[in-house]
């Protein structure tokens, strides 16, 4: 009887240890312990060992959240979080800018990846041309990446009306910013 009880407790312990969520994993609906249903007020508990800075411009009546920035213990920025609704602590999250390269997708993409890595591992759904960057979207993962136009050939840098194809983007072009967006 003791052996059976010991076996059951051992199984329970092993299962409970394997259910811990990777704090740096990016999925379509989560990043670490933050999910698309996480409320702004929950960030204090989730990042209790880190520092949280939220900037409110204006006064408490007209103020708006600019962003909520999460810093690690060393003062390095990890994430910038934009709520769906300003000044509403029960709001969920609209957008997360992923700063720290320790955050990675299941396919190994992080904020230090190159365009080749993105193109090899994801189906690119859209490329938008803006004034200073191109925006590479991967709708299947709720991700988009910005790449500085300085990474592009000179004939593509100065006209934001040009249609840019993925074949025109150098493989070694580095990601400028990595975003996880939850529209719904």
Task: Place the predicted regions along the sequence by residue.
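Bacterial Sec-dependent N-terminal signal peptides
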Residues: 1-24
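Short helix/turn-capping signatures at newly exposed starts of structured segments
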Residues: 17-122, 126-131, 140-141, 161-184
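Short aromatic loop motif centered on NTY/YTY
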Residues: 129-151
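Short, solvent-exposed loop/beta-turn-alpha elements that line the ligand-binding surface or hinge
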Residues: 154-157
